[in-house]
């Protein structure tokens, strides 16, 4: 191949192939959890480009940023992308560093991808579906309560260390250094079928946007 040749994207490229692994054990998940530092980067591979090189998404504040929107026509693979991204984050970061709430407006199919019997992905701390309408309001109360809890913990850490301000990155570094004892992970709120949620639950969406705005420095 000469230098101008392009890599031919395969029709099917598995998650393990993206990590150059043949078996799950070869992902070396525990080693990744120990070595990857969520205070410096939150990068996770999500695919390959036309040169065969990894495409990486990094939602760290100093990289791509914490908010994002996936757009595509019906059947274009938006849900598959979300599954890939969630798994990639889980492979690279300990549940003490990254956790997730799933808002699944496809009837629970997304959440089901991360659970087999009684075994589920430890990073997923909550699931909201369009089947459980009453659960929407309960979940919002829980998220707002978590924001207040984080504010209290960050203030306690600030007083303990005499820091001027504490954000999620500083707090996690204090935890990794053993200065504070309770882990507080980044909490990602991931919504599948965002447009459907916005149309059916506009008040919930307004509150969710407010949570995202207020919660940025708190890791939400």
Predicted regions and their residues:
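P-loop NTPase catalytic phosphate-binding loop
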Residues: 1, 16-17, 24-160, 178-220
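N-terminal accessory nucleic-acid engagement/regulatory domains that precede
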Residues: 1-11
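Intrinsic disorder/low-complexity signal
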Residues: 10, 16-19, 161-162, 166
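Short glycine-rich substrate-engagement loop in P-loop NTPases that contacts/grips substrate
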Residues: 154-172
């Amino acid at each position: 191949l000469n230098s101008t040749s392009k890599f031919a994207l395969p029709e099917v490229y598995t998650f393990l192939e993206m990590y150059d692994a043949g078996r799950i054990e070869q992902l070396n998940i525990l080693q990744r959890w120990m070595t990857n530092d969520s205070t410096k980067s939150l990068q996770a591979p999500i695919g390959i480009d036309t040169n065969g090189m990894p495409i990486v998404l990094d939602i760290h504040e100093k990289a791509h940023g914490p908010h994002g929107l996936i757009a595509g026509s019906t059947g274009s693979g938006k849900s598959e992308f979300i599954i890939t991204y969630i798994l990639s984050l889980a492979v690279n970061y300990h549940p003490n560093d990254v956790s997730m709430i799933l808002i699944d407006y496809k009837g629970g199919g997304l959440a089901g991808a991360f659970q087999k019997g009684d075994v589920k992905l430890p990073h997923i701390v909550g699931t909201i579906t369009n089947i459980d309408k009453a659960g929407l309001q309960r979940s919002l109360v829980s998220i707002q309560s978590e924001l207040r809890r984080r504010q209290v913990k960050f203030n306690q850490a600030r007083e303990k260390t005499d820091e001027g301000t504490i954000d999620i990155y500083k707090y996690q570094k204090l935890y990794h250094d053993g200065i504070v004892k309770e882990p507080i992970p980044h909490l990602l709120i991931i919504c599948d079928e965002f447009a459907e949620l916005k149309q059916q639950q506009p008040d919930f969406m307004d509150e969710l946007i407010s949570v995202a705005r207020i919660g940025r420095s708190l890791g939400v």
